Amino acid sequence: MDNHKIPLLGHTLDELKAIAVDNGLPAFAGKQMAIWLYDKHVDTIEEMTNISKTNREKLAQRYEIGAAKFIDAQYSKDGTIKYLFPTESGKFVETVYIPDRDRATLCVSCQVGCKMNCLFCQTGKQGFEGNLTAKDILNQIYALPERQKLTNIVFMGQGEPMDNLDNVLKVTQILTADYGYAWSPKRITVSSVGVKGKLKRFLDESDCHVAISMHTPIPEQRASIMPAEKGLSIEEIVELLKQYDFTHQRRLSFEYIMFGGLNDTPLHARQLVKLVEGLDCMVNLIRFHQIPNVNLNNSDEKRMETFRDYLTNHGVFTTIRTSRGQDIFAACGLLSTAKKIAGRENSGEHQ
């Protein structure tokens, strides 16, 4: 990949048409480029054979496809694969491929590190190192060896999607547009802790599924483990969500990591049921995966099942999520590239 050239990957149809016109090509060449990119997945401009050789050479002077192959992969005993991809800024980001019988989910990242600093998340301990570009996000799909097997994409990797909303929306547009991947929005879920102003914009502009990181229904307690609560409270989030329809195409879920003795009590179950009353939603209970220097513990299986049963019996559909990739630190809350970046810088491999 030539760092002096502009990547075509990550551009919308309108942007590709503008690139075509700016370089003396007809506007319809933008549509041709989109097909070669998002349908054919070419590696070079030279492969765009329905564009004249002269015009391909003209484009190649300033542009390239821009796809970047993964530079490391870790394989879990359960079939999960964690990939390490380089970014345009020379940093690195992790992506997790999760096969499961007839489904294959890709957990993509949208930032290097994260600003949210949730107590229980390893990514937050890394600090915030920058937003991924639309190209960086899309490259995690474009350059994935198992790309053709994918059935679902979840924005649940490193970073807060609402904190990089322009690029997240741009990527979901390319994924769902006829000129792009032509995926149904039902195949894409975007998670968020809830960011003031940004969550509403996402709900207004996207039809993708929404997953809200709740982790406790009690505002004061949520603020103690999730600083974002102070910007947009869980009660304000729920009131906002009640303004939208989740009874048809778009699905709403709440993510709830279970901490032993902290948020797994009958009181929390009752408060959660009361909080989401009137919302068409589901709750995903998640096992806590221990991270260094954090005084939190996982809830035991019996308490998780009791919590699930209470919610289900009170009309809130609830599941206990199966942990995947824990042996390669690919499970929920474990993604971090801090040590990998430092290691490559020390060895002279940092790009």
Protein language model features and the residues they cover:
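Auxiliary Fe-S-binding modules of radical SAM enzymes
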Residues: 1-93, 242-250, 258-351
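Short linear Ser/Thr-Pro motifs
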Residues: 76, 109-110, 191, 213
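Generic beta-strand structural signal
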Residues: 81, 93, 104-108, 116, ...
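P-loop NTP-binding catalytic core
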Residues: 89-98, 102-103
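Canonical Radical SAM [4Fe-4S] cluster-binding loop centered on the CxxxCxxC motif
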Residues: 99-136
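Ferredoxin-type iron-sulfur electron-transfer modules in oxidoreductases and energy-metabolism complexes
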Residues: 135, 139-147
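Conserved AdoMet/S-adenosylmethionine-binding subsite of the radical SAM
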Residues: 145-152, 157-321
